[in-house]
Amino acid sequence: MIRIRFGMDVLLVLLLATCLLTPAHGTPLEWDFAVTLRTKIQFMDSSWQTIATAAHEFDELSALTFDESEELIYFNDLKHRNGSIFSLKRDLIAANHVAEQTIARTGNESVGGLAYDPLNMNLFWSDTEQRKIFFAPIHGSATPQVLVDLSAEGGRPDGVAVDVCRRKLYWTNSNVTHPTVERINLDGSNRTVIISSNIDMPRGIVVDQLSDRLFWIDDLKGVFFSVESSKLDGSDRQVVLKDKHHEPLNLAVTNDAIYWTDRTTRAVWSHPKVPVIKVTTTSKPDEEDSTDSTDFKDPEPVAEDCPLVRVANLSEEARGIVARTGFYQRLQKDHHCASIVRKVKERVDEQSRKFEIRSLLDQKIKVLEDERCMNDGEYRAATDLCICPTGFKGSRCEIRECHNYCVHGTCQMSELAYPKCYCQPGFKGERCELSVCSGLCLNGGHCRVSKDENEAPSCECPAKFGGARCEQNSTEICSLFCRLLKHEPEMYVPFGCHSICEELAQDNSTNIAIPQYQHLEVCLTPRVWTSSVIIILVVGIVSSLLLVAVIVQGIRRLYKPKRPRIRKTFVVRKQARTNSAGDTPLTNRPLATEQCEITIENCCNMNICETPCFDPKLVEQTLSKSSCKEDKKILIHNMEDDLY
């Protein structure tokens, strides 16, 4: 019986060892990003490949937050009848997830944003319907309390974020009439508006503890949106990105990028954030090469990545998003966060001590658990996780962060637990991937780098080339002086040009490609009479002549004298006239009592539209046989007949 029991104990130990030492694929343990869709939570790795999904029993998920100290995710379901906020943890035995109710539903809540304080273990959330911000402890059944009430002032709280190190809560007020970004102490005191101008409708917000900055999304008017950043007090405001045709809700920040969910495209997008942690690329004195200089070849050019990247396509509408930040490793030496991290770690360690060793089997399991975490990682039985020391990562702390990180340099971990490269002489860049000689020397010049890091690299130029970058062709320059020497033999010639002039004279070649040198065109005599200049000159002369001709013709017509108008005056006297038998009232008109004067213009001054001064038919009949005196008589006689 003892042997059978001992065999069963050994078998059980082996089974447990297999479970502990085998990576739990398909579980949320290895994830780097978590995104809430409408009906599930999707876990993804660093390359945005889906590794697991959870919370399928819910219908309307929205916001979520992450407790990295205990590996718990808190999320909200808008349609659940009993609960409002739930927690998601990993089952150690079944290797899957378990969702539990954390905050009971008290009414028609509409959670807009979630945040968690790992020190006091409190949840904070915004209610867009009641226009208030609540908080409640995750353990126990305490009634949620109001931290901020915006209903009286017409505000609408949306995104919330906790500054764990400085003990403050930040939120966005998406009221379109008076949008703001505000903060308050976690105890409810010292409420402050930090952003109130040049903002339309702020949505999600996050506190980046690594850079001590705020990042938030602003849904601008029309189809535009922006991602903005500032210091924790609202100063040093920067626009990280401005684009259009997105409907972003929430965002997450890592060391080098910003990620946000977009409801329009059903995707997760990323954009580089401004690097705050400067990577040192200087050379360490004890690692310098003993030689005075080193030869380098130009590396291959590095292509730039698109700043706006669609990292994940989702099957449903994307809403909340969280990312791992390495809370323990990154902030252990931060002067604002070191004390908070220490207190949180002490609390987690106290919970781990509750798993006491009671038998030999437990001792064997304990040994296997300790062996699960590599590189002195600390095993957490409550969460089945390894807390890795600085410089290591992975589910078992098996990955060294400096491994293959620096291309031409030595890697060390910085005070903020990030890899930092000390570059070899002649290299630069965040990972020492760029050569200082890249593109420096021209025309086949050879780059030389001194061991003194303060001394700039130099170029060794081939024959007949000079300059700091071998950009000057000495043959082309000296050829100009050679031409001048033919006319002024006593002029000054730079050193070395005499021998080149002799070579050119022996070569008897005049086809020197002087215009090919980019700086010599200023020394050449410019060609004035080019074809374009001649064409413009001819066109200008012809146009000037035509203009002068038009002006002269206009002046002549303006000052040309008019033709004289010839006027003749005839005095007609009254004559005795007897009435004939054939006179009628129409033919026998009354005559003037005295006399009248008739002015007759010369017909040569009349045009065709004027009334002629005599009957043309009568003139035709008498033209051949009448003299000038008879014409006048006929004309006067007809005029007398026309008078009334």
Curated annotation (Swiss-Prot):
Disulfide bonds join C402-C411, C406-C421, C437-C447, C441-C459, C461-C470. Residues 27-531 are extracellular. GO terms for molecular function: calcium ion binding. The chain crosses the membrane at residues 532-552. InterPro entries: 6-blade_b-propeller_TolB-like (IPR011042), Cueball_EGF_LRP_Nidogen (IPR050778), EGF-like_Ca-bd_dom (IPR001881), EGF-like_dom (IPR000742), LDLR_classB_rpt (IPR000033). Residues 280-299 are annotated as: Disordered. Its main location: membrane. Disruption phenotype: Accumulation of spermatocytes with cytoplasmic abnormalities. Early spermatocytes are filled with small, refractile cytoplasmic inclusions, late spermatocytes often contain up to three hook-shaped structures in the cytoplasm. Testes are short with incomplete coiling. The sheath of pigment cells that covers the muscle layer surrounding the testis frequently peels away, particularly from the region near the tip. Female fertility is also reduced, ovaries are small and misshapen. One of its GO terms (cellular component) is plasma membrane. Gene3D superfamilies: Laminin (2.10.25.10), TolB, C-terminal domain (2.120.10.30). Residues 398-430, 433-471 form the EGF-like domain. Belongs to the cueball family. Residues 1-26 form the signal peptide. This is Protein cueball. Pfam families: Ldl_recept_b. Glycans are attached at N82, N108, N175, N190, N313, N473, N508. GO terms for biological process: oogenesis; positive regulation of circadian sleep/wake cycle, sleep; spermatogenesis; triglyceride homeostasis. Has a role in spermatogenesis and oogenesis. Might have a role in triglyceride homeostasis. Probably by regulating lipid storage and catabolism, plays a role in neuronal function. Keywords: Cell membrane, Differentiation, Disulfide bond, EGF-like domain, Glycoprotein, Membrane, Oogenesis, Repeat, Signal, Spermatogenesis, Transmembrane, Transmembrane helix. It is a single-pass type I membrane protein. LDL-receptor class B repeats lie at residues 121-166, 167-211, 212-257. It is found in: Cell membrane. The gene is cue. PANTHER family: PROTEIN CUEBALL, VITELLOGENIN RECEPTOR-LIKE PROTEIN-RELATED-RELATED. Residues 553-644 are cytoplasmic.
